[in-house]
């Protein structure tokens, strides 16, 4: 019998321990909190509702409008459903980037259930954003007291940085000047104003343009800020035919010449880098050379003109000539006798001979160059006969 009782006592012991363990596992206060989150997407509005549904006397609903205004409605009602107080609180926010719901615990035998409905619509914006945190907490209380549910709205601003590149003003906009160099022959240039650019070594206009066009236009096309603007700056260069080291910068007038000289003096260091050692104001016509054929033709023409002029001068200083090569108007008799000085009234001459000489002198002085004839004979023959006599 004792053995049978001991066997029964041994069989019932595990049941007692099991019951004792079950009793020890039961807590004095039972709390069960269940959170249900139901996401719903509506493209036109944003709503956040939080409600505590079982054995609670206070429920809150939070609504976020898309325009950036958050409205909190606090509704207090008793267990029978009668509304006691309605209060409204408005908080302005720009947008919602984060929503956190943190339920707390309460040492009570009342079981509460919280449901949250979230409606989110995405709208791109370039403004500053803020982070909104909703923290509903259940404070501990007695089992007989209604549970107190509080929701705190915490807004933490988030800085939004936007890097904007500065927009340049109209005055700060750099001027765009396109420069170009044109090469021409010095004989084809019709202008007279020019500046001779002395190069360190002999170079043609095309070679100089190929190597230094951009840099030279930057120096000579510089303008004041008030005159700056989009345009084209054209420079005309001509190769000198007299001086191989000289490139002529041809200019239109004195005003442009004075302006370019100032720029060249201002940028002398830059000119040396371009191979220009010096610059002087010179006339374009002085750098034109004539060809050898042209020079020969000019010299020949000058010599012929000189010969013709000399010949004409000597001809103008002499009278007309006779066929025998003697000057007309002079009698050979006068030439032989000293121009008519041989007639004298010497003591050995008879008066008849003097009369004949005076008679013969008249025809010789008549200006015809020949004496009058008598009986078909010239006066010269009679004079010879008289002289012989």
Swiss-Prot record:
Q: What does the UniProt entry say about where the protein is found? A: Membrane
What's the domain of life for this entry? Eukaryota
Extracellular topological domain residue ranges: 34-294
Q: Keywords in UniProt for this one? A: Cell adhesion, Glycoprotein, Membrane, Phosphoprotein, Signal, Transmembrane, Transmembrane helix
Topology: which residues are Cytoplasmic?
Answer: 316-389
Q: Where primarily located?
A: membrane
GO process annotations (BP): cell-cell adhesion; cell-matrix adhesion; glomerular filtration; leukocyte migration; mesangial cell-matrix adhesion; positive regulation of angiogenesis; positive regulation of odontogenesis; positive regulation of vasculogenesis
Its biological function? Answer: Possible adhesion molecule with a role in early hematopoiesis by mediating the attachment of stem cells to the bone marrow extracellular matrix or directly to stromal cells. Could act as a scaffold for the attachment of lineage specific glycans, allowing stem cells to bind to lectins expressed by stromal cells or other marrow components. Presents carbohydrate ligands to selectins.
Q: How does it sit in the membrane?
A: Single-pass type I membrane protein
Any one annotated GO CC term: glomerular endothelium fenestra
What sections of the protein cross the membrane?
295-315
The protein's recorded glycosylation sites are 55, 107, 126, 142, 149, 200, 253
Q: What organism is listed for this UniProt entry?
A: Canis lupus familiaris
Modification(s) after translation: Highly glycosylated. Phosphorylated on serine residues by PKC.
Annotated family: Belongs to the CD34 family.
Please tell me in which tissues this protein is expressed. Answer: Selectively expressed on hematopoietic progenitor cells and vascular endothelium.
| Record's keyword annotation contains Cell division | no
Signal peptide feature range: 1-33
Q: Disulfide connectivity?
A: none
Has the keyword Phosphoprotein been applied to this entry? yes
Q: Encoded by which gene? A: CD34
- Phosphoserine: which positions carry it? 350
Give the protein's recorded name. Hematopoietic progenitor cell antigen CD34
GO molecular function terms listed in the Swiss-Prot or TrEMBL record = carbohydrate binding
Q: Where is this region: Disordered?
A: 325-389
């Amino acid at each position: 019998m004792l053995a049978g009782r001991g066997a029964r006592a041994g069989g019932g012991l595990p049941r007692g321990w099991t019951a004792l363990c079950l009793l020890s596992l039961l807590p004095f206060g039972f709390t069960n909190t269940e959170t249900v989150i139901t996401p719903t997407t509506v493209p036109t509005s944003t709503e956040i509702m939080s409600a505590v549904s079982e054995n609670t006397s206070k429920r809150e609903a939070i609504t976020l409008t898309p325009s950036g205004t958050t409205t909190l409605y606090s509704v207090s009602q008793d267990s029978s459903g009668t509304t006691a107080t309605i209060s409204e609180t408005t908080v302005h926010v720009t947008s919602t980037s984060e929503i956190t719901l943190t339920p707390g615990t309460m040492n009570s035998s009342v079981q509460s259930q919280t449901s949250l409905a979230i409606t989110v619509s995405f709208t791109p914006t370039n403004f500053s954003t803020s982070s909104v945190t909703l923290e509903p907490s259940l404070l501990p209380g007695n089992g007989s007291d209604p549970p107190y549910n509080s929701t705190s709205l915490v807004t933490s601003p988030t800085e939004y940085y936007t890097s904007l590149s500065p927009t340049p003003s109209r005055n700060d906009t750099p001027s765009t000047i396109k420069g170009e160099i044109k090469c021409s022959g010095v004989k084809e240039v019709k202008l007279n104003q020019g500046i001779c650019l002395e190069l360190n070594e002999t170079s043609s206009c095309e070679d100089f343009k190929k190597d230094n066009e951009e840099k030279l236009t930057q120096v000579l096309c510089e303008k004041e800020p008030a005159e700056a603007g989009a345009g084209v700056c054209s420079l005309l260069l001509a190769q000198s035919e007299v001086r191989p080291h000289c490139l002529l910068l041809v200019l239109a007038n004195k005003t442009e010449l004075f302006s370019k000289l100032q720029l060249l003096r201002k940028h002398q260091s830059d000119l040396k880098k371009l191979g220009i050692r010096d610059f002087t104001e010179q006339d374009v016509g002085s750098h034109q050379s004539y060809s050898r054929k042209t020079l020969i033709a000019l010299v020949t023409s000058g010599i012929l003109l000189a010969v013709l002029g000399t010949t004409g001068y000597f001809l103008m200083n002499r009278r007309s000539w006779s066929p025998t090569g003697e000057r007309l108007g002079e009698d050979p008799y006068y030439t032989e006798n000293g121009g008519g000085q041989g007639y004298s009234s010497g003591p050995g001459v008879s008066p008849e001979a003097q009369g004949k000489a005076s008679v013969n002198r008249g025809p010789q002085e008549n200006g015809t160059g020949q004496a009058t004839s008598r009986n078909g004979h010239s006066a010269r023959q009679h004079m010879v006969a008289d002289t012989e006599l």
